[in-house]
Amino acid sequence: MGMKISELAKACDVNKETVRYYERKGLIAGPPRNESGYRIYSEETADRVRFIKRMKELDFSLKEIHLLFGVVDQDGERCKDMYAFTVQKTKEIERKVQGLLRIQRLLEELKEKCPDEKAMYTCPIIETLMGGPDK
């Protein structure tokens, strides 16, 4: 049996506006309506919403999720396309990790320079972040 939008949202732990947004973006299909005019969503749609939510938690963009659905919804070159996508996403994650490690090293260095409770205008952390003497 199908679900109304509020039931779908509750089952997937999202809000109704999120469901409508995914529909507008083409991530889920517009559902048929019952005789009362209510949209009735299938369990397959619920699975897609849960998949979208999981991918968002893993920091995938909606554009990337849309691309994944394009591959999943077409049986053709699925494995080849998924491999290429995975390679690209792995490189992107490696770049993000390197960026975060650079930020971490900078913050560790700045923490060592911080004497304690100097006024803000003499704080070496603020000076460095604003492009001051310790660039």
Swiss-Prot record:
GO terms for molecular function: DNA binding; DNA-binding transcription factor activity; mercury ion binding. Hg(2+) binds at C79, C114, C123. Keywords: Activator, DNA-binding, Mercuric resistance, Mercury, Metal-binding, Plasmid, Repressor, Transcription, Transcription regulation. The keyword Transmembrane helix does not apply. InterPro entries: DNA-bd_dom_put_sf, MerR, MerR-type_HTH_dom, MerR_fam. Residues 5-24 bind DNA. PROSITE patterns: HTH_MERR_1, HTH_MERR_2. The keyword Zinc-finger does not apply. GO terms for biological process: response to mercury ion. Mediates the mercuric-dependent induction of mercury resistance operon. In the absence of mercury MerR represses transcription by binding tightly to the mer operator region; when mercury is present the dimeric complex binds a single ion and becomes a potent transcriptional activator, while remaining bound to the mer site. NCBIfam families: MerR. Homodimer. This is Mercuric resistance operon regulatory protein. The gene is merR.
